Swiss-Prot record:
GO terms for molecular function: transcription coregulator activity. Pfam families: Med5 (PF08689). This is Mediator of RNA polymerase II transcription subunit 5. Belongs to the Mediator complex subunit 5 family. It is found in: Nucleus. Keywords: Activator, Nucleus, Transcription, Transcription regulation. One of its GO terms (cellular component) is mediator complex. PANTHER family: MEDIATOR OF RNA POLYMERASE II TRANSCRIPTION SUBUNIT 5. Component of the Mediator complex. Its main location: nucleus. InterPro entries: Mediator_Med5_fun. The gene is NUT1. GO terms for biological process: regulation of transcription by RNA polymerase II.
Length: 991
């Protein structure tokens, strides 16, 4: 057998065994290495002579994610040899490409320009062919690939590798002859997002007489601090923040900040205070997610006092007086617009602020909490609060702020809390009445030191509960935290959230059902709450299960499962990667089929769910088979074997708390079904899918506050995905009750921005007050909004640059303009670094002719520098890799330009390199390894073993982020969209 025969056999076997797409690609790559093959032949792949959704997933992953099958060859084969399969496959591939993360870097690769040509020519050829069938195929291609072609056209810019704008225009003109609508959309996207071309006037006519400041500007300081928001979970930790401060404010001849002269350290305190208040103001202006607001609020309350303590580790009374003066000046000297934003954020009346003698009126806000936190830290004298706020009429007693935990009006030590948590009777009372909920509710009211102490103690308690097999308090902790995300965000600043996830993963791995279990429903509820909160943590903080083993063990004297097991063997990893319905439902083991049969009988017969049934299979097995239950039930209903009323009646069992945790995977499956049926035009089964969704979402009581805790936790994860899927069904002409959207809207608003999600009369989609930004499923803060700006991308960038220039010209009065740094980064990836850089340099030249060139250089250099820092150092789901090429492109422009244009490029380059050097990056390209990062001290946990070292443990699982994705992934595929064509490709004459 040659390679093609072996590949066809491998494909058939994998499909028969329902092997996942990711695993199939790994097996294919291994086969190619053994056979010496360089790419997949589509003829061999389609030689398997089998066709279903899983095969579609194989094709998509090979062609558009792992690049083993060149896309243009796939399209060529489909055009010639796969007529019977073309519509379904193209619709599937088109949907996958349409749901692709729109900010994934497409790279400067010739293959994409070829793909553009193939797509346009393919559509044109299909439309132009005689015969209705070929034209229908062309329509499918246009619908399926239209969005993807739009994205490619708008992104490639100067990276088109030989495909110039006139060539694209010519191709679109040809396409317009057969379908003006499609051609119009693509042409509008190409010209609109790229922006109207302007005649360059930079080279000969403009003189660049720009001063180069040697000190940090407020703009650069603020953008650099805000870049902390783009990092992974470790950036939340104090060590990373102080490392950044130490680098930015380093002084030659002084090895540490604490060794610098007193006046220098005092100046740093003032700078940091102003920067953090600026950053919080920016989040208010942009209406950012609650997680970001929580981050900066907690930074002000907890990080600033620690920074002062680090700068003055043994402060004298005289030094405390000087510190008080700096803090007072910084707090009382905030710009009035900044103060107004702070006041409005707590619901204060703007008119009260305007006429108050002290900036801020009579309500307590974050400024008062900062001073109280500094007193608690011991860096300010005890009478500092009254001295600073003597004219405000507010005393320290007015703050709902404490240095110790207070429960039911009584002070409680952490030792007492830990003891009572261990022995509390959780069989009676609700979650809101338990001690854990009361403790979590106090988190926001504590001082920074108290928050950190409480967080670490709760983590130790959690680890102890898990090691002892005491799962009930673990469940109550999960529910209490899931319903108070502000407390979770605070805890994530005190310890790495990976530690919290690690404890929960250990609990899940150690889960065993007792043979004499008296209450199986409670056991299922316990497990479901723990799993759902673990998924919430993973999504909210972008955590990677493959990194769990780098944190040692949380157990006393024993290794924990997550410290020793390969990540792909963890149950949570299996649940997140194998929940895809098509991978599992049609190929269940005999044991799973028996379980499915038993559960189906219990759900739809009069007997109901018995303890014997729940005893017959483990809760883990039930979670893995739950999507299959829904799939088989749907098939039975379609075949007339199960009435709709009986179907819905059985599904109502899943609204019981003990089964709700398993519906996370079901919601994922249902959202896929909504899309599948939406693509079929009028589909009788669509009403059934929508009805099932409504059954699982709505309850008899529409008051969200009376939902069970586990129901709220599940909806907090799944609401945004279900909302979009149902909204798509509504746009396709199907009936969806408005109350379903009304019920989901509070969850969607909480997940995304702090703005209300509303539905307009004219459109069923979101009405957003923002453009592109960072938000996400489960409150993760990563899922991108679509582009909402009416102007072109480049016009929007210039508008933001202009606003920042105006702020700089006005001596930085007022809070910074609510700029979208992530939007600027995305625009660079979309339009190409060279094109954006040319446009910004043109702005410098034009501004210089108006006498504002030095302000423009400062703004452009700041944006370029921070973009470069983020793109080269941040481990995030979206690394903005094209921004890494900014400096290289600027180098080329310096070498190629002449005259005044060269002067501008040289000046901008020197300013960027100056800022990069200030930020701790080497200008020669051999940058320091990654972001400023300091190893955190986890000894409060790991030293309990006496032997365990905090060292990474090798994980041979070859598990990638894409294998760990679940709620953040598309159907059958992950977020990481990468293609490597391995150099130039000779384009065959396909047409």
């Amino acid at each position: 057998m040659d390679f093609n025969d072996k590949l066809a056999t491998l494909t058939r076997v994998c499909l028969a065994r329902r092997v996942s797409a990711g695993r199939f690609v790994k097996l294919t790559r291994h086969l190619m290495e053994n056979e010496g093959a360089s790419e997949v032949n589509p003829k061999a792949l389609f030689g398997a002579n089998t066709f279903d959704l899983l095969f579609f997933a194989y094709v998509h992953k090979l062609a558009f994610e792992d690049s083993l099958l060149p896309p243009y060859k796939l399209l060529a084969y489909l055009k010639v040899c796969a007529y019977g399969r073309l519509p379904q496959l193209l619709m599937y591939l088109g949907k996958q490409l349409q749901e692709m993360d729109t900010d994934v870097d497409l790279g400067a690769n010739a293959g994409y320009s070829y793909l553009i040509q193939v797509l346009v020519s393919f559509m044109k050829d299909a439309f132009a062919s005689g015969g209705g069938m070929r034209k229908r195929y062309g329509t499918s291609i246009a619908k399926g690939f239209g969005f993807f072609a739009e994205v490619l056209l708008t992104r490639l810019g100067d990276r088109m590798a030989g495909v110039t704008a006139p060539e694209i225009t010519s191709q679109l003109a040809e396409l317009a002859k057969v379908d003006a609508t499609i051609a119009g959309r693509l042409g509008e996207a190409w010209m609109g997002l790229k922006g109207a071309a302007k005649t360059s006037t930079t080279a000969e006519t403009v003189a660049a007489t720009v001063a180069t400041p040697t000190t940090l500007t407020r703009l650069y300081r603020d953008t650099l601090f805000e870049s902390l928001m783009f990092g992974d979970s470790s950036w939340n930790q104090y060590g990373s923040l102080f490392q950044l401060i130490s680098t930015v404010y380093a002084m030659p001849g002084y090895p540490t900040l604490a060794s610098q002269p007193v006046q220098s350290r005092l100046a740093i305190i003032g700078e940091v205070i102003c920067a953090m208040f600026d950053c919080q103001s920016i989040t208010f202006l942009r209406r950012d997610s609650a997680k970001r607001n929580n981050y900066w609020k907690s930074c002000i309350r907890t990080r600033i006092p620690r920074i002062i303590r680090t700068l003055f580790p043994h402060s004298t009374p005289e030094e405390k007086t000087l510190i008080q003066s700096v803090v007072s000046k910084s707090v009382l000297g905030l710009d009035q617009p900044t103060v107004t934003l702070i006041r409005l954020s707590i619901g204060s009346d703007e008119l009260d602020d305007m006429f108050s003698s002290f900036p801020g009126g009579l309500d307590v806000d974050i400024r008062h909490e900062l001073v109280a936190a500094c007193i608690s830290e011991g860096v300010l004298p005890k009478d500092a609060f009254n001295a600073i706020f003597k004219d405000s009429g507010i005393s320290v007693e007015a703050l709902d702020y404490a240095d110790e935990l207070t429960i039911d009006g009584q002070a409680m030590s952490l030792d007492t809390m830990a003891e009572q948590l261990s022995y509390e009777n959780l069989e009676i009372g609700s979650v809101s009445d338990c001690l854990m909920s009361k403790v979590v509710a106090q988190m926001e009211k504590l001082s920074g030191n108290a928050q950190e102490a409480l967080t670490k103690r709760l983590l130790v308690c959690l680890a102890d509960f898990v090691q002892a097999g005491n799962v009930r308090p673990v469940r109550y902790m999960c529910q209490a935290l899931a319903l108070n995300t502000t407390a979770v965000d605070i805890m994530a600043l005190c310890v790495d959230p990976m530690l919290l996830l690690k404890a929960l993963v250990d609990c899940i791995e150690l889960w065993r059902e007792e043979e004499d279990e008296a209450n199986y429903q409670e056991a299922y509820t316990d497990f479901g709450a723990i799993v759902v909160f673990a998924i919430t943590l993973k999504q909210r903080y972008h955590l990677d299960l493959a990194l769990l083993n780098q944190f040692g063990t949380l157990f006393v004297g024993a290794p924990s499962p997550s410290s020793t097991m390969p990540s792909h063997e963890l149950f949570l990893s299996q649940l997140l990667t194998e929940s895809d319905s098509s991978q599992r439902i049609f190929h269940l083991s005999d044991e799973q089929n028996d379980q499915l049969s038993g559960w189906a009988t219990a759900l739809y017969d009069a007997g109901g769910i018995s303890d014997d049934l729940m005893r017959s299979s483990s809760v883990k097995q039930f979670f893995l088979v739950t999507p299959a239950i829904f799939q088989q039930s749907m098939l039975a209903h379609e075949k007339g074997l199960l009435s709709l009323s009986t179907f819905k009646g059985g599904l109502e069992y899943f609204l019981q708390p003990f089964l709700l945790g398993s519906t996370v995977g079901v919601f994922k499956w249902l959202s896929e079904q909504l899309w599948v049926h939406s693509q079929k035009g009028h589909d009788e089964q669509m009403s059934t899918v929508i009805s099932v969704c409504s059954t699982l979402i709505l309850t008899d009581n529409t008051d969200i506050e009376v939902l069970s805790p586990i129901h709220q936790m599940v909806l907090a994860i799944c609401a945004d995905e279900m909302y979009e899927a149902l909204d798509m069904a509504l746009r396709a002409g199907y009936m969806v009750e408005n109350r379903v959207f009304e019920f989901l809207e509070p969850f969607v608003s909480a997940i995304n921005y702090n703005l209300n999600v509303q539905r307009t009369v004219s459109s069923s989609g979101f009405r957003s007050q923002k453009g592109i930004g960072m938000s996400g499923g489960g409150g993760s803060g990563t899922k991108e909004q679509t582009w909402k700006y009416g102007a072109s991308m480049i016009a929007t960038i210039k508008e933001q640059v202009s606003s920042l220039i105006s702020w700089s010209q006005n001596q930085y009065t007022g809070p910074p303009f609510g700029y979208e740094l992530v939007m600027i980064l995305s625009s660079v990836d979309t339009l190409g670094h060279k094109y954006v850089l040319e446009q910004l340099i043109e702005e410098i030249a034009l501004a210089d002719s108006n006498g504002t060139g030095h302000y423009t250089v400062e703004v452009v250099a700041t944006i370029a520098t921070v973009a470069f820092i983020i793109s080269t150092s941040v481990k995030s789901p979206r690394p903005f890799s094209d921004s890494q090429l900014i400096l290289k492109s600027l180098d080329n422009m310096v070498n190629d330009s002449t005259g005044k244009s060269k002067d501008i490029c040289v000046l901008l380059q020197s300013k960027i390199l100056q800022l990069l050097t200030t930020a701790g990056y080497k200008p020669d390209g051999s940058r320091l390894d990654g972001k400023p990062h300091a190893k955190e001290d986890y000894s409060f946990v790991v030293n309990r073993t006496g032997e365990v070292e905090n060292k990474p443990i090798n994980d041979s699982s070859q598990n990638s982020n894409t294998d760990n994705q679940f709620m953040d992934t598309n159907m059958f595929g992950g977020d990481d969209f990468t293609m490597d064509f391995g150099g130039d490709i000779d384009m065959p004459d396909l047409f």
